[in-house]
């Protein structure tokens, strides 16, 4: 049975950026299997900011992996930016992801031997997007967007965790993706840096980006307009928690 989905019709009738349809994901464990996602369905439309919450080990990060194509469902469909992600070959999947999805990881995953500037240029190089000279200019612009232009030539290990996370967000924006997916983006940050990251996410959504975020921080999650709560591999709650808390954040 398809779960209640308050955003199925989208903002102003917009088409979904993300469609998750009856998705099941099981992993083999010895001679048996463990089912982590149990028939999940929901849509996300252009310009939405959605927080995915729930206890550890209940399928939140697995769901993000389905949406980004890092992993594939055992059953069901995952359609993102019009592509049936679960059906793409690895080569086509990598090309699609490089163009359409920006991923912000919990532990930054910046290449330690490259400067912040080089790390942000790398997705453009891999996707062969933008002219070589424009890539550098764009990377500097993105570093300026996250307040790190003066740190451009430093290695990741020379800046703070909060600065690395902001650089990781800039890297996720390198190819101007329609969708940004963030897995515990504030999990290793103090409250001030967490607030800065959320403020940046809010500005990106205001500019028309679509953002999906997994978080354990209940207070920050409440500031996001829509919450999807996953418990035991199923959607237990999918609701809008109000523009009043989000407005002016």
Where are these regions (language model features)?
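ABC family nucleotide-binding domain
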Residues: 16-230
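ABC-family P-loop ATPase nucleotide-binding domain
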Residues: 1-26, 237-249
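H-loop (His-switch) and adjacent beta-strand-loop-beta switch element
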Residues: 227-240
């Amino acid at each position: 049975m398809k779960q209640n989905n308050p955003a199925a019709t989208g903002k102003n009738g917009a088409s979904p950026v993300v469609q998750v349809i009856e998705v099941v994901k099981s992993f083999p464990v010895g001679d048996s299997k463990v089912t982590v996602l149990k028939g999940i369905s929901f849509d996300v439309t252009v310009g939405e900011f959605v927080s995915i919450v729930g206890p550890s080990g209940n399928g939140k990060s697995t769901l993000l992996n389905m949406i980004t194509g890092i992993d594939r469902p055992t059953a069901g469909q995952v359609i993102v930016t019009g592509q049936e992600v679960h059906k793409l070959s690895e080569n086509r999947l990598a090309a699609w992801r490089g163009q359409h999805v920006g991923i912000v990881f919990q532990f930054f995953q910046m290449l330690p031997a490259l400067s912040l500037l080089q790390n942000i240029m790398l997705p453009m190089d891999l996707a062969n997007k933008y002219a070589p000279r424009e890539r550098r200019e764009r990377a500097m612009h993105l570093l300026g967007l996250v307040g790190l232009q003066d740190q451009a030539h430093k290695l990741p290990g020379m800046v703070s965790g909060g600065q690395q996370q902001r650089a990781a967000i800039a890297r996720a924006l390198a190819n101007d993706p329609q969708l940004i997916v963030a897995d515990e983006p504030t999990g290793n940050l103090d409250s001030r840096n967490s607030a800065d990251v959320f403020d940046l996410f809010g500005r990106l959504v205001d500019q028309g980006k679509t953002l999906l975020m997994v978080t354990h921080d209940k207070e920050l999650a409440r500031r996001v307009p829509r919450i999807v709560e996953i418990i035991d591999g199923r959607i237990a709650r999918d609701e809008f928690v109000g523009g009043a808390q989000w407005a002016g954040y």
